[in-house]
Amino acid sequence: MLENLCTLPLSADLFTQVLHPSEPLLTVGLASGKVETFRLPNDDDEEDESGRRTSTSSGRGMIKSIWSTRRHKGSCRHLAYSHDGSAMYSAGTDSVVKHFSPETGNVISKIGLPPRNSATSTTDCPAILHVLSPQTLLLGTDSGGLYIFDLRENGSLNPKPVRKHVPHADYISSITPLPASAESTSGFPKQWVSTGGTTLAVTDLRHGIVATSEDQEDELLCSTIIPTGLGPKKMRSNAVVAVGTGNGILTLWDRGAWDDQQERINVAGGRTKKDGESLDAIVRVPDELGWGKKVIVGVGDGSLSIVDLKRREVQFVLKHDEVEGVSALTFDYQNRLISGGGRTVKVWAESGDDDLDEEEEEEAEATGFKRPARSDSDSDDDSEDERPQKSSNKKQKKGKGNQARSVAFPGLD
């Protein structure tokens, strides 16, 4: 179903990765505070220097470092692109949010987070960023706070947040926008689902927190939305949100019924809660691949589980790493899967063998490839040397900057 095209080594543990919406650009944020952008092989790059055609149409070629810098004094916790890809934002443990150019990495503007509350001068630590629309950026924090910032015409952040809500009692682990209603004139979301600690919440841009779930008695770590096709009977067009938990269970939530989960899929659970592996990252498989209603889940044991949401089962298991868990999953605009965790990023593409016959399925099960479901100082000097640091990111309990480097894909002459 998927084959690994390339493994990209990193200089420190990965905290976050993000892909340009329309260009083959991958940016990573590391525990050392370093941010680096790579150019992935592109279908348009059809000839090499000697004029020979390369195999980039299948996603093979060279990954090249475009720029690198120490963006934050502490770790880089999260990255986000603007909707059109013209601007990027980073947030670090230094409680600073920076707006910079994706092509050069040059900082255009920056802001510091306000104090956590009126009773203290201590600033909160950012945990996650999400650009909701061309005018709005959301920032979730370690304390469960959620700030709403206005974006100016050039993408710069207004220094003061427009609003602050506190939907969770613990750090915000994911933000998933809900599709705009049919009556929307802009087409951009006005509501979003967030997870933090052991609860799920829904927040409205204008009206604040509109729903909070019951205590799930398990950490909710990641989420994604399936817009149609999985809702209850006679409501198949209703959206469903898939949420990964700390004990290896993938839970499904019907839009509008936010008090509790409706379905459970055992992805990496054990006999007890302590035995399960955490589900730290999730991504919906693009419709263009024609796989049906599936998600790929990054697991704390370093595996990638491909989950069929209609059958409520794990169909295939791949391996990102033997030791480190998978902390980030994204599909690029060419529908290649990018998995990240530990000190490696991997690029995956369809192998061409989408349909296994019965004999192949038996062989896959015998080798363990297929697993059935179970029951239940602001330094932007590109020449600065980097030294990996220990991470303070709660989700990870479990050379020189400007020199270009590249990694070859296999299969080239």
Swiss-Prot record:
Matches recorded under Gene3D superfamilies: YVTN repeat-like/Quinoprotein amine dehydrogenase
Start-end of Acidic residues biased regions: 353-365
Keywords for this protein: Nucleus, Repeat, WD repeat
Gene Ontology cellular component terms for the protein in this record: nucleolus
Main location (coarse class): nucleus
InterPro entries: WD40/YVTN_repeat-like_dom_sf, WD40_repeat_dom_sf, WD40_rpt, WDR55_POC1
Region named Disordered: 39-61, 353-413
Domain of life according to the entry: Eukaryota
Location of this chain's protein in the cell: Nucleus, Nucleolus
WD repeats: 30-70, 71-110, 120-159, 220-263, 277-317, 321-358
Keyword match Nucleus: yes
Sequence similarity: Belongs to the WD repeat WDR55 family.
PANTHER family attached to this UniProt entry: WD REPEAT-CONTAINING PROTEIN 55
Protein name (record): WD repeat-containing protein JIP5
Protein source organism: Podospora anserina (strain S / ATCC MYA-4624 / DSM 980 / FGSC 10383)
Lineage start: Eukaryota, Fungi, Dikarya, Ascomycota, Pezizomycotina
